[in-house]
Amino acid sequence: MRGIDFIAIDFETATGRRASICEAGICVVRDGRIAETRSWLVRPQGNVYSYWNTQIHGIRPDDTEMSPDFPEVWTEISEYLRACPVLVAHNAAFDISCIRSSLELYGLDKPVVTYYCSLRAARKLYDFRCNTLDYLCGQFGITYGRHHRAGDDAEMCARLFLREIKDSGSPELEEMVFCNGKL
């Protein structure tokens, strides 16, 4: 899939607030191949966690006590976005709202980015009873790491979206217009 470049992204949050990012993960895809996967623990404002969120991802205040805050991590992620301003997320509405809320909370500029949603693509392309990331990866034999850990989820999202591009018959990422938006 030459010419298919994007960054799959995933966030875990400490509470129900979208700006409470406690882990960020990216998976860089260049020419249709995974080039790099990274994740960062992030100290959310106040380092406060809800019981329910911790039960989902297992990240605790002790894990992020000495971690960088969102602006520091976003500076690193922004370097990747300058090279490739195309994001993909599974349930992009959640992840994009995390970005928007965090940028607003910290008074940071919004980048010019196009995003695609692998969940919307799955709903359009397939007729599965369930469209969660782990279920879809299981259906396609995509090996899964630790579910609800941002780096692993970002990589699985990238692998799934590459499959969706192939299954859509679209040789160009831009043709996946049924699942995109602007940050």
Provide a role label for each language-model segment.
Residues 1-2, 158-183:
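Acidic two-metal-ion nuclease catalytic site recognized across multiple nuclease folds
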Residues 99, 121, 157-161:
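Buried hydrophobic packing segments
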Residues 109-122:
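Conserved beta-strand -> loop -> alpha-helix junction used to position metal-binding or nucleic-acid-contacting
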Residues 73, 156-157:
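Short Asp/Glu-rich motifs
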Residues 153:
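Conserved catalytic/binding loops enriched for acidic/polar residues
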Residues 1-112, 127-130, 134-148:
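Conserved non-catalytic scaffold segment of RNase H-like nuclease domains
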